[in-house]
Amino acid sequence: GVVSSAIGAMKGAGSAGYLLDGASNWVYRGLGEYLAQGGDLFRGTRTISTPEGDVAAGAFWLPGLSEQAAGRLSSDFGLTLTALSAAPAPDALSVVRTPRVAIYRSWRAPMPEGWTRWVLDEYGIAWQNVWDADIQGGALSEFDVVILPAQGESGIRDGNDAGSMPKQFVGGLGAEGAAALQSFVEDGGWVVAFDASVDYAISTFGLPFRNRTRGVASQDFFLPGSIIRLEVDATHPLGYGMDT
């Protein structure tokens, strides 16, 4: 069969920029291009009312977007943009800035590390790899976010065993790298841990969470490629745009 692309739309009238619902994943691909061109971007922290109807918390306001650029954004990514005749209230907005993203890459980098890079590339999000020595040497001061791709705890902490390969490829983050990550967070940075790397974050930083499947044999719990149900608080910034 033929898979049809999403069809975008332009609604409303006015010269106070455009409002973009945050529910579509492709929103972020389009916003990446807008930010790369130096546009100002804000996000609604509560429902914003327009003559075309209410838009839920998490919508993006693009005050500097021209009608021509809005049309391209709509057609290229299948998005619906609402033109505004007046700017949203300042207390209903938060400023969005392009984060400086680092992806941790160990000398035992697993396949998910490559998939993480691919996903960011698909959405036009710039990133740089950081290695053990980079983190230990203070390079995190150049970033806002560090992603720990899905990797086992020992692979991140210990890396390759001494003697198993040349010296420069041996070891992991160790205590020095863990301390650098903790200082990074304490200074306002974000660490995002995916899947198995969450175990590293929990044990290293003493987080008040527990992996309930840790230590459970695969014959007792096996969940490959499954769809599970989540309860999401769509009023929280991490849940903006999600169904409740």
Set out the residue ranges of the language-model regions:
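Intrinsic-disorder/low-complexity accessory segments
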Residues: 1-244
